[in-house]
Amino acid sequence: MPSELFDLVPHDKRWFPWAEIEECFWPGRGRRSHTINPSLASIKNAAGIYCIAWAPITTIPAPDEENLQYVGQTKNFKARMAQFASSAGIFWEDRYAGHSAAWRWPQGETAQMQIAFFPIQPELDHMLTGRLFWYEALAINAYFQKHDNTLPPLNVIKNPDPVAFV
């Protein structure tokens, strides 16, 4: 049986503010991601677990972070961040379909948004899918155990209203 501990290493062992992700993942006409942030650009099309938090946060990312708001998994970090931004009203003044949890994010808010990426090594698609779900469950469980059997706020799907951060 695989480990029941979340043992993925956060990319660059740090949180990335939204502004840094946006500049690298969508650099604009004539610019290239790898010239803006080579390290972050190296994982933009990778699969893995991502954690979204609201600063202040600890230095080293972990899924049991006090101000963690969401844990998710994806086969492409850039595509998933685009979906989140579209639904959270970050790219435009309105919200659009793309990421269901982002509808619970305060519309357009990015000032204290921090994201950690935990890449997973590429493998056969059916194995990658299983590993993504397994690690997402481990990450959510790490938060659940440390925070009195509660889920990260945006992972609570029955809450129809945007979360208010204090």
Language model: regions and residue ranges:
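Boundary/linker segments flanking structured domains
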Residues: M1-Q69, Q73-V166
